[in-house]
Each structure stands twice: as structure tokens, then as C-alpha cells.
Amino acid sequence: MKLLRAQTAGFCMGVDLALKKLAALIDAPAKDAPAKAIVTFGPIIHNPQVLEDYAAKGVGVVNDPAAIAPGTTVVIRAHGIPDPVRRAIADRGAEIVDATCPKVKKAQTLIQAQAKQGRTLLLFGEEDHPEVKGLLSYATAGAHVFGDMEELEKLDLPHGPTYFLAAQTTQDEQEFLRIRDYLRNRFGAGLTVLSTICNATMNRQQEAMDLAAAVDFLVVVGGRDSGNTRRLAQVARSAGTPSVHIETADELSPGMFTGYATIGLTAGASTPKKIIDRVQQVLESY
């Protein structure tokens, strides 16, 4: 059995930066000062194995500013948080360490600038995703969220307001382009389009498409709560390539690959290298 591993599999820049910031806090407490409690506001990334490792090191997770004690070090998750929540955390007397992905922060800034001009946001994203909740907080002139073209077509969008289009940073680029063309046809040149999908996401999705076309079966590794990982699995399904989405190598068995000569391996942006390496090791043993 031949194995092909995606070069883009594993941590993206934003995840890597966030985890390095958290690791620095754990490994280098202030000299001659009592250790401060360290918490993340929401899961710092969407990977249960990483979260378990940090929990074992004493890093807590909070989801409500009211639960934060004064003096606590609060690390903002890579997905970002709503602006009012950030202010509420500061009001609790916490020390804030911002680990928001730079690409997410740029999207927040771009959306805020458009909203200040009175434009209404049309956001392509998962309504319940933490990144989306954060982005919406900057759309102070109004917003509509939709997860796909079907949901968009059902929205009541009168021609009075001036709209602008943006996307969750990990959304599907090809679907976004279809949505852009549909909205331009509907609203004309008055529609402002923001480029907020991360380049790393686009590259990862393109490589997954190429890999799906070159293999008989594709293994996608990453947390089941990870939106970008789920979209990689969707790429394989759209290509008609048999696939499986797993979190760890423990979910594999030789019988899954009976009759397949070439296996592809890719992983989401929040999947640690050691987990991908272990999956590769197990696959190569079959």
C-alpha cells in the first residue's frame, strides 16, 4: 500500500503562534512573584488532544467573563472573541494575552472599517463558530450569516442597504467565489467584497483536492469540532474519493483499506505533528 502525505498537513501559522504564546506563559512565570492562574477564553484551538495536554499542565478554560478572578491571565483563543466580551474580561481585572490569529484579527479590522461606513455585512460562515461570533461583533451596522448558497438565497435582503461580503477565514474558497458572483449579479457594483479567507486554508484545500484525485482513499486527521478539518473531509466527498475523518490513529483498522492501493493523508490546521506522524506510522504498518 502506497501512502501520500500532504505537505500542508498540520498546524497553520495562527495555531502555532497561539500555542507558542500559551507555552511561554506556562514555561516562564515571573521571577519572585506568585504564579498566576492561566486560563484560555474558550478552547484555544479545536483539538481535544491538545486541550487535554494543557489541562494536565493546569491551564483552565472559561467561557464566561464572570467566572474570571481578578489577576488571572486570560489567553484569547486563536479564533478570537467578540469585542464586548474582551471588554468584560478587562473589566474583571484580568491580564489579557491576545492569541487571536493575525488573519482573524485582520478580518475583524476590515469588517469594522466597512461597518463604520454604514454597510451591512453578509458573512459566509458557521453561525455558531466562535470566530464568526467574534467577527459579527464588529459588524455594528447590521449583519446576515449564511452557511451555504441555499441559506443565502433564503435571506430577505432588500435593495435599500449597502452590503459587503466577507467569509470566515477557514471557509471553502470555491464556494465563496460562487457566492460572490451570485451577489454581484444581484446587487451590482455596489457590493464590496473582502478577501478574508486565509491563504493557508486555500492552499490546504487545494492540496486536499489534488490528493483526492491522486489516491484511492483519503484519511483526514483533526478534531471533530474543527471547521477547517471538516471542510477537508468535504473536499474528498465532493471529489468522490472514499475517505474517513479521524482524531487519532486509534480509530484506524486494516479492514478500512481493503482493496485500496494508494492512501492519502492530510490534516487540519489544529492537528499536532505527533498525531499525524502516529497515523502515518500505523498506516505504513498495514
From Swiss-Prot:
GO MF annotation list: 4 iron, 4 sulfur cluster binding; 4-hydroxy-3-methylbut-2-enyl diphosphate reductase activity; metal ion binding
Active site: E131
Enzyme Commission code: 1.17.7.4
Family: Belongs to the IspH family.
Protein name: 4-hydroxy-3-methylbut-2-enyl diphosphate reductase
InterPro entries, per database record: LytB/IspH
Bridged cysteine pairs (disulfide): none
Keywords annotated in UniProt: 4Fe-4S, Iron, Iron-sulfur, Isoprene biosynthesis, Metal-binding, Oxidoreductase
UniProt binding sites for dimethylallyl diphosphate: H46, H79, H129, S226, N228, S270
Textual note on the cofactor: Binds 1 [4Fe-4S] cluster per subunit.
Chain positions recorded as isopentenyl diphosphate binding sites: H46, H79, H129, S226, N228, S270
Residues noted as binding [4Fe-4S] cluster in the record, renumbered to the chain: C12, C101, C198
Organism (species): Solidesulfovibrio magneticus (strain ATCC 700980 / DSM 13731 / RS-1)
